[in-house]
From Swiss-Prot:
Pathway: Amino-acid biosynthesis; L-arginine biosynthesis; L-arginine from L-ornithine and carbamoyl phosphate: step 1/3. Carbamoyl phosphate binds at S55, T56, R57, T58, Q82, R106, H133, P134, C135, Q136, C263, L264, R291. It comes from the Bacteria. GO terms for cellular component: cytoplasm. HAMAP family: OTCase. It catalyses: carbamoyl phosphate + L-ornithine = L-citrulline + phosphate + H(+). This is Ornithine carbamoyltransferase. GO terms for molecular function: amino acid binding; ornithine carbamoyltransferase activity. The gene is argF.
Length: 307
C-alpha cells in the first residue's frame, strides 16, 4: 500500500519538529547555493505550478527553486486549466498525479485547494489562497531566524487589516509559541472562524484595535498592502487604515533592534513610509529572497529529501 503524500497546506497542520526541519534545510541549502555547492535532491522530479491569476514572486521563486533542486517546473494558468469549470477539481488532481510528482497551486478559493489535495496522490503545496499564505510566512520565519535567532518567546506585531498573511502568522504563533499582537480597525478585524480558532487552540495571540499598543516592545513589526487580491473597496479602506501606517513614530515604540517585515509589493506612503521600508530595520528584500530558499525547504520536505 502506497503511503499518503506529504501536503504543505497550512502551518498549523504540521508538527513543530517538521516545520523546524524545513527551516533548517532551507538554511543549509541557501548556504550551499551561496557557496556554489548546489544540492540537487529532486533530479528527475516534475512540479506542476497552477496559477489562477498572474504571479511574479510565487512563480519565479518556485520555478527557480525547483530548477536549483534539479527538478523541472511546468506552469499552468487558470485560463489553460479551466479549473473546476470544465473538468472537476477532483479529476484534475487525479490526472495531474499521473503526470507530475508534485503540485503547487495559487488559487483564491481555499476549498478548491483542499479538494485538490484530497484527491491528489502526489504532494500539494499551498502557494497562496485567500485564506492563508504559508509559504510567505515560512520565508518570514527564516528571515527572522537569520537576523535574530529563534523566534520562540519573541513578540511580533501586526498592524493593518485581516488577510491571508496574518492568518499564516497566527498559525505560526500557535506552533512556534511567540506572542502575536494584532491591531486592526474593528470592521477589518479577524473573522469569527479565526477568533474561534485562536480561542480553541490557546495560541498566544492578542487581538486589538490600537497599533501603538500592539507594537510597543515588539521584536518584529509586520504589515501588508491594504488592498488584498480581489478587494474592490478603495478609498474607504484607505481612510479606515490610515492610523495603522507603519512610520518612524510607530516603529520607535518597538524594541530598538526590532525588524520590519512586509511581503511586498508595498504601496509606499500608504501602509508604510519610505523612511521605514528603506531604513536599517527593514528586511523586506531578505524576505523576498527567502521565498526561494524557504520553498526549497518545503519542496525537499514534500519529497522526503530533508536530511
Amino acid at each position: 500500500m502506497s503511503k499518503s503524500p506529504k501536503h504543505f497546506l497550512d502551518i498549523n497542520e504540521l508538527p513543530l519538529s517538521e516545520l523546524k526541519s524545513m527551516l533548517d534545510a532551507s538554511s543549509a541549502m541557501k548556504a550551499k547555493q551561496k557557496a556554489h555547492q548546489p544540492v540537487r535532491p529532486l533530479e528527475g522530479k516534475t512540479l506542476a505550478m497552477i496559477f489562477e491569476r498572474p504571479s511574479t514572486r510565487t512563480r519565479v521563486s518556485f520555478d527557480v527553486a525547483m530548477r536549483q533542486l534539479g527538478g523541472e517546473p511546468i506552469m499552468l494558468t487558470g485560463a489553460e486549466m479551466q479549473l473546476g469549470r470544465g473538468e472537476t477539481i477532483a479529476d484534475t488532481a487525479r490526472v495531474l498525479s499521473r503526470y507530475v510528482d508534485a503540485i503547487m497551486i495559487r488559487i483564491l478559493n481555499h476549498d478548491a485547494l483542499l479538494e485538490l489535495a484530497a484527491n491528489a496522490t502526489v504532494p500539494v503545496i499551498n502557494g497562496l489562497t485567500r485564506r492563508s499564505h504559508p509559504c510567505q510566512v515560512m520565508a518570514d520565519l527564516l528571515t527572522y531566524q537569520e537576523h535574530r535567532g529563534p523566534i520562540e518567546g519573541r513578540t511580533v506585531a501586526w498592524t493593518g487589516d485581516d488577510n491571508n498573511v496574518l492568518a499564516s502568522w497566527a498559525h505560526a504563533a500557535e506552533r512556534f509559541k511567540f506572542q502575536l499582537n494584532v491591531a486592526t480597525p474593528p470592521e477589518l478585524a479577524p473573522k469569527k472562524a479565526m477568533r474561534d480558532w485562536i480561542k480553541a487552540s490557546g495560541a498566544p495571540i492578542m487581538l486589538g484595535t490600537d497599533p501603538e499598543a500592539a507594537v510597543r516592545g515588539a521584536d518584529c513589526v509586520v504589515t501588508d498592502t491594504w488592498v488584498s487580491m480581489g478587494d474592490k473597496e478603495g478609498e474607504h479602506r484607505h481612510n479606515v487604515l490610515k492610523p495603522y501606517q507603519v512610520n518612524a513614530k510607530l516603529m520607535s515604540l518597538a524594541k530598538p533592534d526590532a525588524l520590519f517585515m512586509h511581503c511586498l509589493p508595498a504601496h509606499r506612503g500608504e501602509e508604510v513610509t519610505d523612511e521605514v521600508i528603506d531604513g536599517p530595520q527593514s528586511v523586506v528584500f531578505d524576505e523576498a529572497e527567502n521565498r526561494l530558499h524557504a520553498q526549497k525547504g518545503i519542496l525537499a520536505w514534500c519529497f522526503d529529501a530533508v536530511k
